[in-house]
Amino acid sequence: NARCLISLALMTGNVGKRGSGLHPLRGQNNVQGASDAGLIPMMYPDYQLVDKDNNKDFFEKLWNTPLDDKKGLTVVEIMDAIHENTIKGMYILGENPAMSDPDLNHAREALQMLEHLVVQDIFLTETATYADVIFPASAWPEKNGTVTNTNRQVQMGRKALDSPGEAKEDWWITNELGKRMGLNWKYKHPKEIYEEMSLTMPSLNN
């Protein structure tokens, strides 16, 4: 429990001085990088709040599209919204809420209730068993890209193996879906995506 660790560090005087502090590991690989890039429902990339007009204006201009300034739902709130019949479809990429949600029975019931579920993953996970559509994704050694570790260091990965069968890189699948939905996405390589990220994330300029 994070609060217990914080309390312990405070009680023992291990906060605010050299060689002290907390450094808890995050739950999954690259969760730090995903958070930095804006995969938090109330934030744009680099932890810029969606309900601040100057942030919204910046990203609307950069992406040339209108954006909603309402905060999104957390994973737990999404499961509640499915039970309330306000969410009817989901696209789950690289997550397994049928095993990771704090209330598994509640989450599994929610996944069963969806009218349409798309899952993109490298394995046929427990969540994928509820899916109407499965996109097979590439594993880490099968693609180019970066991850950000808990220490906020960006680490490059280079493709070492070809993907099996019909598996594709995550960015490619997302890019193709965007194009088929009418978006003018023209990414050809993760390098181009990273260059755009650097425009939105001052934290990368280190």
Predicted regions mapped to residue ranges:
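Non-catalytic alpha/beta scaffold blocks inside enzyme catalytic domains
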Residues: 1-7, 11-205
